[in-house]
Design a protein with these regions (language model features):
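Conserved PLP-binding catalytic core of the aspartate aminotransferase-like
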Residues: 284-317
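Active-site C-terminal subdomain of aminotransferase-like
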Residues: 13-14, 190-280, 381
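PLP-dependent enzyme catalytic core of the Aspartate aminotransferase-like
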Residues: 328, 332-381
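Active-site phosphate-binding strand-loop segment of PLP-dependent enzymes
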Residues: 114-171
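Conserved beta-loop-alpha segment that forms the PLP phosphate-binding cup at the N-terminus of a helix
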Residues: 52-81, 85, 89-93
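A glycine-/small-polar-enriched, mobile loop at the entrance of the PLP active site in fold-type I
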Residues: 3-59, 63
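Conserved active-site segment immediately N-terminal to the catalytic lysine
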Residues: 178-190
Length: 381
């Protein structure tokens, strides 16, 4: 018998309370019971998004809600600034181009943060920009971009919306939607919300609704107004993922019980323990010190070691599933997720499995040093 540990940045582990709720007999979505759970879920999402504005919930992946943001805010030929320093910034650019937008491309290495000064310059040099699109927590690289600073810049442009991909940010890092002037913020269920994949949500500010009013891009399933009119009646325009919504309600109540500030602090502690543990093993962190998020820790594979073998052996021999690198970094980095339903001993277990794996693969280090470093973080409180 072996216990498995899912230590990826998505999907993430699902609490037993949520699983039990989703395993209950299905209910119809046009009933008072579902409407009550749906209304509570919307209220809970507003809590984790830290917004008093509108929140919409979709049966889709995170990519779906990314596409929805573009389809609802722009017209063919509109100019948008896309900030990209990872795979999901790249995806935003691809979606924008598919919809016929003119992209001002702020492209950085995956190991770099987006510079807010570059956003300011792009807005100054390109009059009439209708949107700025940026990833807050870049899942592929572990980089955390300063959307607060970018929000302050975009706020000076009344016709420019700021769209933020916080799919691995919400619930893991601070994201003050209203206070920071973020017009559209997106997340997915399989990340910090502690659910299986299948739901995605976004905020819509008053400025974003003004952008919607002028948008002429085609939309049907992802038409924001269809959802908003139904949210006001505690229902959905189309058949929802009923069991996922019921599970979402439970998961959001768990976050409320812990308290959002405490939830974010827990993620920060888990991330710091993971980073210190890896560094104690002599491993190099991928994300720069000035921009490390709390959702995932990417680590360079040491010279002479097969990166894919690390991922494979940790799963096959120790039941610990971590993620490999993506695109050009496949086999060159591995990624440890600590996003959502994780505690201190998940990190200890993962570092123990990593140590044993590295030792078997011939990497030389002081055995136990990674675990000891992580324990020090947890004992510091």
């Amino acid at each position: 018998m072996r216990k498995d540990y899912l230590m990826t940045p998505g999907p993430t582990p699902v609490p037993a309370e949520v699983l039990l709720t989703m395993a209950a007999p299905i209910i119809h979505h046009r009933t008072p019971d579902f409407s009550a759970a749906f209304a509570e879920s919307i209220a809970g999402l507003k809590y984790v998004f830290d917004t008093e504005g509108d929140v919409l919930l979709f049966a889709s992946s995170g990519t779906g809600v990314m596409e929805a943001a573009i389809a609802n805010c722009f017209c063919v030929g509109d100019t948008v600034v896309v900030c990209r320093n990872g795979k999901f910034g790249d995806r935003q650019k691809q979606i924008a181009e598919v919809y016929g937008l003119n992209v001002v491309d702020l492209h950085y290495e995956w190991t770099s943060v987006v510079d807010p000064a570059d956003v300011a310059t792009a807005l100054e040099e390109n009059p009439g920009v209708r949107g700025v699109i940026v990833t807050q927590s870049e899942t592929s690289s572990g980089v955390l971009n300063d959307v607060k600073a970018i929000g302050a810049i975009v706020a000076e442009y009344p016709e420019t919306v700021l769209i933020v991909d916080s799919i691995t940010g919400i619930g893991a890092v601070e994201c003050k939607t209203d206070e920071w002037g973020l017009d559209v913020v997106m997340t997915g269920s399989q990340k910090g919300l502690m659910l299986p994949p299948g739901l995605a949500a976004c905020t819509v500010s008053k400025k974003a609704w003004r952008a919607y009013a002028r948008s002429t891009l085609p939309k049907f399933y992802f038409d924001w107004m269809r959802y908003q009119k139904n949210v006001e009646k505690d229902t959905t325009p189309f058949t929802p993922a009923v069991s996922l919504v019921l599970g979402l309600n439970v998961a959001l109540k768990m976050i409320r019980e812990e308290g959002l500030e405490n939830t974010i602090a827990r993620h920060s502690r888990l991330a710091e323990a993971t980073r210190r543990g890896c560094e104690a093993l002599g491993l190099k962190l991928f994300a720069p010190p000035e921009g490390r998020g709390s959702a995932v820790t990417p680590v360079w594979v040491p010279a002479g070691i097969d990166g894919k073998a690390i991922v494979k052996m940790m799963k096959s021999e120790y039941g610990v599933t971590i993620a490999g690198g993506q695109d050009d970094y496949a086999g060159r980095i591995f990624r440890v997720g600590h996003l959502g339903y994780f505690g201190d001993f998940d990190i200890i277990t993962t570092l123990a499995a990593l140590e044993m794996t590295l030792a078997k693969l011939g990497y030389e280090f002081e055995r136990g040093s990674g675990i000891k470093a992580a324990e020090s973080v947890f004992m510091e409180g």
